[in-house]
A protein has these predicted regions:
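Short, intrinsically disordered, charge-balanced linker/junction segments flanking boundaries
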Residues: 1, 56-59, 156, 236-240
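Conserved helix/coil segment N-terminal to the catalytic DExD/H
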Residues: 105, 147-190, 198-204
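Pre-Walker A (Motif I) flank of P-loop NTPase domains
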Residues: 82-88, 113-115, 163-165, 229-232
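N-terminal accessory nucleic-acid engagement/regulatory domains that precede
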Residues: 1-46
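Conserved pre-motif I regulatory segment
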Residues: 41-91
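Post-DEXD/H (motif II) to motif III coupling segment of the RecA-like Helicase ATP-binding lobe
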Residues: 184-185, 189-190, 197-240
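A short beta-strand-to-loop transition that corresponds to the Sensor-1 phosphate-sensing loop
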Residues: 121-122, 169-173, 195-196, 236-240
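Conserved SF1/SF2 helicase motif Ia
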Residues: 89-94, 99-140, 144, 221-229
């Protein structure tokens, strides 16, 4: 089953929910086969796992930004492509969005996976989805209270059908059974917490669902019955 999905020409094809239910470890098999570098000279590794080639192909940039001589963008993007969890602190306007969007779009093509981005502001989610669309990238959607019923249904359908590789939601959306069922039906490759300082700034007595994020990820992992290896998490902030 894993080889059949990997060999599909349409990267938007998804693993059927019945297959995920009956063979939950198929997600790990796909991730292992598609994300494990093999030997030097491998065409697949050069094209699917190289962050520089991904940056050029997807966004049209030749190089990542550096800060005080440090390649922070590249380091964060590479760590995500390698399947690691990470915390990254970037200066305001420092281009942190591309460091999680790039690995998410690469994973969407390589493993047919979905990256869930948890963001505090509806306007911020819309801006990021719109900015990607302006670049011709239609792989991102948002589900939030600004959508009318038709727009919400379309967004949910795009995620369920595999047309979306990035889903932007607020932490409150994790309480929704619709969202929970939706995420159960997809191969979740990573959770991204944007503006991660909200954990401590807000999570105690304002927007307490920030404190629910960890519980939800553990619950999802348990219900998916994949293995003991946790779903990777990336935390990004401009405020440490």
């Amino acid at each position: 089953y894993a080889l059949a999905l990997i060999g599909c020409d349409d990267y938007r094809s998804t693993t059927p929910p019945w297959l995920l239910y009956n063979f939950p470890k198929i997600e790990n098999v796909i991730k292992f086969l598609c994300n494990t570098p093999c030997a030097d000279g491998c065409d697949y590794c050069r094209n699917a796992l190289d962050v520089h080639k991904g940056l050029k192909k997807i966004f049209g940039f030749d190089n990542f930004r550096t800060y005080n001589g440090e390649p922070l963008q590249e380091m964060a993007a590479r760590a995500a492509v390698e399947g690691k969890s990470l915390l990254a602190v970037f200066p305001t306007g420092g281009g942190k969005s591309i460091t999680f969007q790039l690995p998410a779009l690469m994973a969407g093509k390589a493993t047919h996976g979905l990256t869930v981005v948890i963001s505090p502001l509806q306007s911020l989610m819309k801006d990021q989805v719109d900015n990607l669309a302006e670049k011709g990238i239609e792989d991102a959607v948002t589900v939030n209270g600004m959508l009318n019923p038709i727009e919400r249904a379309d967004a949910l359908d795009r995620v369920a059908s595999g047309k979306a590789s990035i889903l932007y939601i607020s932490p409150e959306q994790l309480r929704s059974k619709t969202i929970e069922r939706l995420l159960m039906s997809r191969n979740i490759v990573r959770f991204v917490i944007d503006e991660a300082h909200c954990f401590s700034a807000w999570g105690q007595d304002f927007r307490v669902d920030y404190l629910y994020i960890g519980d939800f990820i553990r619950k999802l992992q348990k219900e998916k019955k994949t293995d003991k290896k946790p779903i990777p998490v990336s935390c990004f902030t401009a405020t440490a």
